[in-house]
Swiss-Prot record:
Record function comment: Catalyzes the conversion of 3-deoxy-D-arabino-heptulosonate 7-phosphate (DAHP) to dehydroquinate (DHQ).
Gene behind this protein: aroB
Similarity section: Belongs to the sugar phosphate cyclases superfamily. Dehydroquinate synthase family.
Name of the protein in its database record: 3-dehydroquinate synthase
Localisation per UniProt entry: Cytoplasm
Documented EC number(s): 4.2.3.4
Organism: Prochlorococcus marinus (strain NATL2A)
Length: 368
């Protein structure tokens, strides 16, 4: 175990695990698996996409072989438009060919899409095999890889098909961000800003104090690890309190209700998930101002920080009636009423279940 690694415990009653953050942790994946109880002869299916595998696939496979595991590597296409049943079939076919058993393991090596699909494939193969998440994008490191949400998209909406399936381990190696495209890095910053707004004022203010948070090359390694660690810890603490999203875990959807509408109406691929969430946060911030829940100055601070991160802050050109219709397809709608997580102050939010179409129209007219 590398003493320089940071360990965050996700202390769930039935499925506890750790988030391990540290440089060069990819090389030690075999040792980390041994530390949590896996033994030689373990059948492992590593799922990745070509771009990520070209950089890190050999390193992972060598570490697994060194620990006397039996790995197979599956390369599939990534991208939101690939997050479908056809991709799950590819993973299941590979699991069959690798003769995976219930005690076997799938490893998701990639961004949020690879993590979501591999997690869902693991949840549904043999009614559940082990999964380990090795996120290689900033967004996946601080959000998608933690908490056990897995799934794929449906033609009617994002993530409508899925399951809760907690990983056995989340392994985060910040050096993988070096090969991450600039736009993807900025998209990940949206989720980090989200954590600042929903639960961590100190993180929000830390980001405000930085001269540049939109370019990885201008962020010192110590700061990068700190913001990843704080964000991952925020996510873990919420998941511990509410594993299956029956209460406070809904706070993690801040900005996502409007964000999913943007992705759905604009078509998956037009905007990255983090970009859509950024615009969604600005929109719901305006909704909160309308309701008198938080001060306009806080909404402006949020928008400035989003723009500082190089993220879009202006609402896209969408028909308001189309937005209202799309909102009705949200998973969190109850009795026809749309729920929104809204800020009370920076570092504190609350879920509201009684938002009328009139209020939403007024908000969208204001920001359009």
């Amino acid at each position: 175990m590398n003493k320089d690694n940071h360990h965050i415990k996700v202390s769930l009653t039935n499925n506890p695990y750790e988030i391990v953050i540290g440089k060069s942790s990819l090389e030690s994946i075999g040792d980390e698996l041994f530390n949590i109880g896996f033994r030689e002869g373990l059948k492992v299916l590593v799922v990745s996409n070509k771009e990520v595998s070209d950089h890190y696939g050999d390193c992972i496979i060598k570490s697994l072989i060194k620990s006397k595991f039996k790995p197979k590597l599956l390369i599939i296409k990534a991208g939101e438009d690939q997050k479908n049943q056809s991709s799950i079939d590819l993973i299941h076919n590979a699991a069959y060919e690798a003769r995976l058993e219930r005690g076997s393991l799938m490893i998701a090596l990639g961004g949020g899409v690879i993590g979501d699909m591999t997690g869902f494939a693991a949840a549904t193969w043999l009614r559940g095999v082990n999964v380990v998440q090795i996120p290689t994008t900033l967004l996946a490191m601080v959000d998608a890889s933690i908490g056990g949400k897995t799934g794929i998209n449906h033609s009617k909406g994002k993530n409508l098909i899925g399951a809760f399936h907690q990983p056995r381990l989340v392994l985060i190696d910040p050096k993988t961000l070096i090969t991450l495209p600039s736009r993807e890095f900025k998209a990940g910053m949206a989720e980090i800003i989200k954590y600042g707004v929903i639960s961590d004022l100190e993180l929000f203010e830390l980001l405000e104090r930085q001269e540049n948070i939109s370019d990885l090359s201008n962020i010192k390694e110590k700061l990068l690890i700190e913001i990843i660690k704080r964000s991952a810890k925020s996510k873990a603490e919420i998941v511990i309190k509410d594993e299956k999203e029956s209460g406070v875990r809904a706070f993690l959807n801040y900005g996502h209700t409007f964000g999913h509408v943007i992705e759905n109406l604009c078509g998956y691929g037009k905007w990255l998930h983090g970009e859509a969430v950024a615009m969604g946060m600005v929109a719901v911030g305006q909704l909160a101002v309308q309701r008198g829940l938080w001060k306009e100055d806080n909404a402006k601070r949020q928008k400035r920080l989003i723009e500082k991160a190089g993220l879009p802050s202006n609402w896209p050109q969408l028909e308001i009636e189309s937005v209202l219709s799309s909102l009705q397809g949200d998973k969190k709608v109850k009795n026809g009423k749309v729920s929104f997580v809204m800020p009370l102050k920076i570092g504190d939010v609350k879920l509201f279940n009684n938002i009328s179409n009139k209020e939403i129209r007024e908000c969208l007219q204001k920001i359009s």
